[in-house]
Amino acid sequence: MTNIEKHGFSVIREQRLDEIDATMYELCHTKSGASLVYLEREDENKSFAIGFATPPEDDTGVFHIIEHSVLCGSEKYQLNDPFAELLKGSLNTFLNAITYEDRTIYPVSSRCEKDFLNLVDVYMDAVFAPNLLKNPSIFHQEGWHYEYDPESDTLSRNGVVYNEMKGAYSSADELGMITLNRALFEGTAYGKDSGGDPAYIPNLTYDMVKAAHEKHYHPSNARIFLDGIMDLESVLELLDTHLSKYDRREPVSLAGKCAPRVAPIKRISYEIAESEDEKGRARLMLGYVYSDYTDRESNIAMSVLSDILCGSNASPLKKLLLDKNLCKDMAMYSSKSRENTLVIEVRDIDENKADEIINLIDDTIRTMASEGIDKSKINATLNSIEFRLRERDFGTLPTGIAFAMTIYGGWIYGANPEDSLLYNDILAKVREGMRGSYFEDMLMKITRDNPHRAAVLMIPDNKLGAKEATEDKARMAEILAGMSKEELASVVADEEALRAWQQAEPTKEAMESLPTLSLDDIPKTISRPCAKVEMLCGVKILRCPVKTNGIVYISLLFDTSDLSGEELLRVSMLSSALLNFPTESYSPLELQNEAKANLGSLFASIATGSRDGVITTYLKIGASALLSKTDDMVRLIRELALTSRIDDTAEIKNLATQIKTHLEDMMISSGETLALSRAQASLNEEGAVTEYMGGYEAYKLLCDICDSDERIAALTADISALLKKLTDRRRLTISVTGDASDELLSEIISIFPSGEGDIIKKRTALCADKKEFVLTPSKVAYAVVSGMSDRVKDNLGLMRVVRSILSYEYLWNNIRVLGGAYGCGFVAKRDGALSFYSYRDPNPAASLKVYTASVDYLRELAGSGEDITKFIIGSIGEHDMLITPRTASLVSTTDYLNGWSAEDEARVRREMLGIKAEDLCRAAEIIDSAISCGSTAVVSGQEHLATLDRDGMTVIKI
């Protein structure tokens, strides 16, 4: 490393971190007081983050709104939305901003040095010199504002964060966690909702926003993170241009520990659908503060204990409550912050039995603590945790960004930055604790002996939505009636100013101020994992040739294409049932412990592939392990696949009920997922398959099954028979990543018998209507329009560029910026499916019109001669993914199942590089033709149903 004490920075500390193969440099910017950490690692992906301590003083969501707003133009970049411009034209591998409970972080990453410097510069200018400080319209757009309709003489509220949080508060899980934190940490920042409570967001004023920014967004309160191979001197020089404008001052202090308190049970209501029965739908959340950020051993210990107590239906605490019919599901997890909380969540209970449940949990944990915990179970779970920690596989999340998010969890409070990344010593200490009573002592922290605990009882109310809608309407009428003429004129003027700012065309100078890339900056080659196809013992082998650091990943894919419709739900249920039933040699808990003790993972799931419009579904049984443990892998795969005894109807009922509840929660909190599957289920087989495996069709079937013991018994028998039917060598394809020998694979193949006859494929019939409204207890909407076109496959490069144009320009401006929705987008899939979608949308009727008009926008853009290079660059960047060994295995397998190759990807890339503006007319034709005979699905509450054209619409009540 060359001398890095340049550009106003001085080195405080240098340390080699062998555990992550990095050298850490801790620096300080002398003049401004900014802190900086650089991890010098062999990673071509360069990561940056800047974070600020932002403890909230109220529930207005001020720091969440600032997080959104600073990215809406700055002193150097005079655009309304540089963030959206970066999404259009950057090669970024990560671009986001995140509000935590006491900090706000702005992370970016890119493999391209030029792009990386551009991103850093835009973000630094955004956080320190945002246009927010001089333009109240930015606050009105991203936070909240009044809207007055003179025709109806009504007043309403709108705003991106306001609508985002209305969606969040529609989720029972989020509402419960927010309420629990308020009870545990009353009177502190951690008892406030940093995201913003929709009831309190309107209390926030523009002056309050400016004051909060001035206080918290100063370099002395900033911590900067860098990671990867980069020209560090250039980065430090760039940072100095922003930091040197400031003089050092005292940073914002984060409050110390909250005084321990035992809070009384807090009772709140949560909304369920009007059609739902309230009986047995209450939820209980218990919270126990057990340590602070300095005690990292306790976090690992609590992860171990949570898994032992509640990791599966066979775990002792969860099994006890299920067997006594006191709940339908249960979870236990840690919520980590300055102080760490163990949360026990008990779902679908009788509200009158809450005290009984609390007492039973307390007694059970005390008994386990006094009798001692089986050391082999602790050791097995620790092995599993250690495997994941050493694997350090974050999926598509860049490693540097994952490190940044981890580091801020302790660094923000004054801990050494590296503390959060290093685990060897911590694991050794935790293992040492097994010799004594460490784990038993930790258990006592989740009993009534804990002096810092709280409980929340959530009562279902199927009238709450209508009641709150009526109250909100009355409240807005009252506010309007109380306004003077001058106040109303001010509201109208603010809205007019907002619309004028939103619709103003950026100047040429403003557009040219934003740093851009050219097509020459795009890497000429792509690195996409591709499976090599071999045949072994009559079975197809998919080998993914990437380095795995001694880990072997194997997936066994059993073709289930001779099943369709309702039968596919049984495949999905089977994947959930495996590992929850006894086998020839093990109880469920013993099998799980064997897997944890010897493997990295052992799992069952479902997979699908689509070739030329024909869908193939699979039961997937997989495992990962060190090369030295592959004998155990073979042994446990055999045990799971061939000897599982699925014959316990009570356990099948538990699983069916839990899956039903999970789907119900998903339909409320992630309504766009449901809307997309419903819209596509009326158009293509893939949509129908998705519905039966995990959508509304699955939910509807499970509701019917769970109401009848006879149907549960039939389901149990069907699933048991299905396992025997599917685990057949004729159906098998094996995906392998890592140094697995043919001998090992032959051994796996030999496990499975080979039946006779051909596997006759069945087609799954379409299962949705062309125009649907799914009624859920949600205060915001999710609106989708889908269509099909066989021209997409031959124009995939064009449609990928159009996705960028529509998602980050047209839809962003019309649905997010003007409409106030939290999210929106357009997607075109290789099978020909096209979809528009909105997310946490206050006006789905308007969004549907925007979708229809998109083709006119594309034709107009095609005739304008506008340079669309930035959209090409952004589109290519989206598909140049970062690959870890586990991700490589998944991607290469998925590509094969879908008939996609590295050559296909390279061809599409070449097509994208040659797209011109005039080609957009062709895209408009494809979209116009598809959606003219397409389908519409909207998921929301009653108030939005009233705003839609109901002609020909099917209304589904959840």
Where are the regions a protein language model picked out?
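Hydrophobic, small-residue-rich alpha-helical packing segments that form membrane-like cores
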Residues: P150-S152, S156-N221, F225-D240, D247-A273, ...
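M16 family metallopeptidases and their MPP-like homologs
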Residues: N45-P55, D81-A129, P136-E147, E174-A199, ...
